Design a protein with these regions (language model features):
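Hydrophobic/aromatic-rich transmembrane helices and adjacent perimembrane loops
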Residues: 97, 131-132, 138-159
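Membrane-interface junctions at the ends of membrane-embedded or membrane-associated helices
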Residues: 110-118, 151-172
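Membrane-proximal stem/loop segments at transmembrane-domain junctions that anchor or position
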Residues: 1-70
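Alpha-helical transmembrane segments of multipass membrane proteins
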Residues: 106-109, 130-134
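Central hydrophobic cores of alpha-helical transmembrane segments
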Residues: 1, 121-128
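Membrane-interface anchor segments at the N-terminal boundary of transmembrane helices
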Residues: 55-122
């Protein structure tokens, strides 16, 4: 069931952040149509929210695309989006730990690109989670899983020479 989450990310009131204040309105509307229904209430509620989210995005493609960009920005922002976490000390700690990893991940990607698929796959979680949260709501906390794979590339940036073949140690 993704209806509520989808509507949270694609609706006239969507901002990219989560705000589930719309749920009681949907619950009340679905309860009005409850008589004689064969499916469970939760299934019908999910379908209603999903349908309205898809219809809104279909009718407003430019707004949906803009909202996707906003959500991507929220996910990869260098500091917290939440105002209560936007004091300068918190911003500096978050940016001070995140920005170096990202810079090193980019350098590592450049250094390992010629090594093929295994290193390219380190970007796959970042692409997947970014696209997923471009549809649903987004926050910097959703970048944590892909950061683990990006750290592998960051290590490649600070490690020794990288070649296409394993290094061989010479005997004594």
């Amino acid at each position: 069931q993704v209806g509520a989450s989808l509507y949270d990310g694609l609706s006239p009131t969507a901002t990219g952040a989560s705000d589930m204040k719309f749920v009681p309105r949907f619950v009340a509307a679905e309860r009005e149509h409850d008589a004689g229904a064969t499916d469970s209430f939760e299934v019908r509620l999910d379908r209603r929210m999903r349908r309205e989210a898809v219809e809104w995005a279909t009718r407003h493609p430019a707004q949906a695309a803009y909202l996707a960009l906003v959500k991507m920005g929220r996910m990869w922002n260098i500091w917290p989006n939440e105002p209560s976490f936007s004091t300068w000390p918190v911003r500096l700690v978050v940016a001070g730990t995140y920005v170096p990893v990202m810079i090193l991940a980019l350098v590592g990607a450049w250094r390992t690109f010629h090594l093929g698929l295994p290193y390219m796959l380190c970007w796959l979680p970042a692409v997947y989670f970014t696209l997923l949260h471009a549809v649903f709501v987004s926050s910097i906390r959703y970048r944590e899983p892909p950061l683990l794979a990006l750290i592998v590339l960051a290590v490649a940036a600070v490690s020794g020479p990288i070649s296409g073949t394993p290094s061989r140690r010479e005997g004594p």
